[in-house]
């Protein structure tokens, strides 16, 4: 099977996909995101050190359009597991269709926080802080907040205060802050 992982939770997604495939007895080809390939290289070194037989776990690096599309269309690959964007998920599904391979997609959701009039007084603050987990770079981050009209003005004030109190610093520094986003493209998406 082909395992195609995202940049925003690289080691988490690599571990989840590889462990599931290994337990099922599958051989696998892992293609990590080109934005965060070093986690997968480290994981490959750990697999080798653990004594996995040659050919059971395989790592290829490259971009989605080039390498990912080749994996999803390859006739010797029976399944593709992909976590990432809806756009890429559609392309993988179309590419995989010609070989009738199974496709597993996790395309995120960006669910909403619902804040009703009787909600806990910390609901808005908690919701904003959940968005900031992983520097806000999560497919499941609740980036929308739907607030009952009677709490709206208060919620806007609380959300702004909470967001303005979040500090950005080096990812390697200790303390309570968020790190930088992965690249300029993602930073621009946040600004837009």
PLM region descriptions:
Residues 2-123, 175:
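Rossmann-like NAD(P) dinucleotide-binding subdomain of oxidoreductase/dehydrogenase enzymes
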Residues 73, 79, 87-192:
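ALDH superfamily catalytic-core signature
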């Amino acid at each position: 099977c082909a395992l195609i992982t995202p940049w925003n939770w690289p080691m988490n997604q690599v571990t989840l996909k590889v462990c599931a495939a290994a337990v099922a007895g599958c051989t696998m080809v892992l293609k990590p995101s080109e934005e965060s390939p070093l986690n997968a290289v480290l994981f490959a070194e750990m697999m080798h050190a653990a004594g996995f037989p040659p050919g059971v776990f395989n790592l290829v690096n490259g971009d989605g359009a080039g390498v990912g599309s080749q994996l999803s269309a390859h006739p010797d690959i029976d399944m593709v597991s992909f976590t990432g964007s809806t756009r890429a998920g559609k392309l993988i599904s179309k590419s995989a269709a010609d070989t009738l391979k199974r496709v597993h997609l996790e395309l995120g959701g960006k669910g909403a926080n619902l804040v009703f009039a009787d909600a806990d007084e910390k609901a808005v603050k908690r919701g904003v802080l959940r968005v900031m987990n992983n520097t806000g770079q999560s497919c499941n981050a609740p980036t929308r907040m739907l607030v009952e009209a009677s709490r709206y003005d208060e919620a806007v004030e609380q959300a702004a205060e909470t967001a303005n109190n979040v500090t950005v610093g080096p990812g390697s520094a200790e303390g309570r802050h968020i790190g930088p986003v992965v690249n300029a493209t993602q930073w621009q998406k946040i600004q837009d």
